[in-house]
Amino acid sequence: MDKMLLLLGVSILLSEVFAQTDLTGKVFVFPRESESDYVKLIPRLEKPLENFTLCFRTYTDLSRPHSLFSYNTKNKDNELLIYKERMGEYGLYIENLGAIVRGVEEFASPVHFCTSWESSSGIAEFWVNGIPWVKKGLKKGYTVKTQPSIILGQEQDNYGGGFDKSQSFVGEMGDLNMWDSVLTPEEIKSVYEGSWLEANILDWRTLNYEMSGYAVIRPRCVALSSYNKIS
């Protein structure tokens, strides 16, 4: 009986740490600045990326720089990184080379962010709350490598670690999806408005993840209409 209870306890603990879950209507909450709180995402990725689109929603009152999506490989720091430099300024980094985009944004307001990149042209596109921002170009002809460590809540300085709390994310993050293609403007708008478009790398409805430290899952309290109001 004791062994059965022990196994049951371990099973429950593991289910809280590692899970594949439909997170529709929910968010990851990172409630404090730290170097220990994060969520690791496990992608469905078998070959290098020649194209991608990544979308997610965030809600934070941070004014300092912070990481939004950190994708490292064993041989490359910042193989793919989304970094918020300051209010109204985002950076997309591929193999440590960055493209910075700037636009109008309200402080402490919910944000829906999308970025796409195409290897053949090197063109990166950015969308904030359904509005296209200026296109940039970087790493034409490159392919983003596989077997990544993908971290939300922290910026990796090495594979799966090297965190600095001054770069940590504090707030809510949800509706994160990643495709191995460049979505059309119509598809971006549809996703922004709350429609579901099945994603083949990371899908919020079938997400594999591991939670570490003080990161929790809660119902999303910010209505989708709130994103529409500020666009």
Swiss-Prot record:
Cystine residue pairs: C55-C114
The keyword Secreted is annotated on this UniProt entry: yes
Cofactor: Ca(2+)
Cofactor note: Binds 2 calcium ions per subunit.
Binding site for Ca(2+) 1: D77, N78, E155, Q156, D157
Record-level GO BP terms: acute-phase response; innate immune response
One function term, GO molecular function aspect: metal ion binding
Family annotation (Gene3D superfamilies): 2.60.120.200
Sugar-modified residues: N51
UniProt KW keywords: Acute phase, Calcium, Disulfide bond, Glycoprotein, Metal-binding, Secreted, Signal
Any one GO cellular component localisation term in the record: extracellular space
Record's miscellaneous remark: Plasma concentration of FP are altered by sex steroids and by stimuli that elicit an acute phase response.
Coiled-coil zones: none
Pfam families documented for this protein: Pentaxin (PF00354)
Annotated family: Belongs to the pentraxin family.
First and last residue of the signal peptide: 1-19
Pentraxin (PTX) domain ranges (all copies): 24-223
Xref: SMART domains: PTX
Native organism: Nothocricetulus migratorius
Subcellular localization: Secreted
Positions of Ca(2+) 2 binding: E155, D157, Q167
InterPro entries (UniProt xref): ConA-like_dom_sf, Pentaxin_CS, Pentraxin-related, Pentraxin_domain
The keyword Signal is annotated on this UniProt entry: yes
Name this protein carries in UniProt: Female protein
Subunit field text: Homopentamer. Pentraxin (or pentaxin) have a discoid arrangement of 5 non-covalently bound subunits.
